[in-house]
Regions:
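Terminal-proximal interaction/regulatory segments of ATP-powered molecular machines
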Residues: 28-103
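AAA+ P-loop NTPase domains with strong preference for DNA replication initiators
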Residues: 1-39, 52-53
Length: 103
């Protein structure tokens, strides 16, 4: 197994775009205020990936995704961390998006 290192050129926009593409939704929907489940989960996963892959601060993550308050990012990331331990589909989605970011 070859461990891939994070490319220096990876941006927040790329993470958001790849997440949207994976879930077959528009990038604008991830950044919107819509609360339907098929948009909320990809948004939360995008926040999680921005934190884990780009090591962004909570306020910066919130700003990237059009959120007013960084506590939304904290809650979302904690939720995905918890859910990924219980739900293999969440883990698989995260792994698939990560793979698309690095290949």
């Amino acid at each position: 197994n070859v461990k891939t290192s994070r490319p220096q050129h990876l941006t927040a926009k790329q993470v958001i775009s790849k997440t949207a593409k994976h879930f077959q939704i528009e990038t604008e929907e991830i950044c919107s205020s819509k609360r339907s489940k098929h948009i909320v989960i990809p948004r939360q996963i995008a926040m999680y990936l921005l934190r884990s892959e780009l090591h962004m601060s909570f306020p910066k993550i919130a700003k990237e995704l059009g959120r007013k308050d960084h506590t939304t990012a904290i809650h979302s990331i904690e939720k995905i961390e918890k859910d990924s331990k219980l739900n293999p589909a969440i883990r698989d989605n995260i792994a698939s998006i990560r793979e698309s970011l690095y290949n």
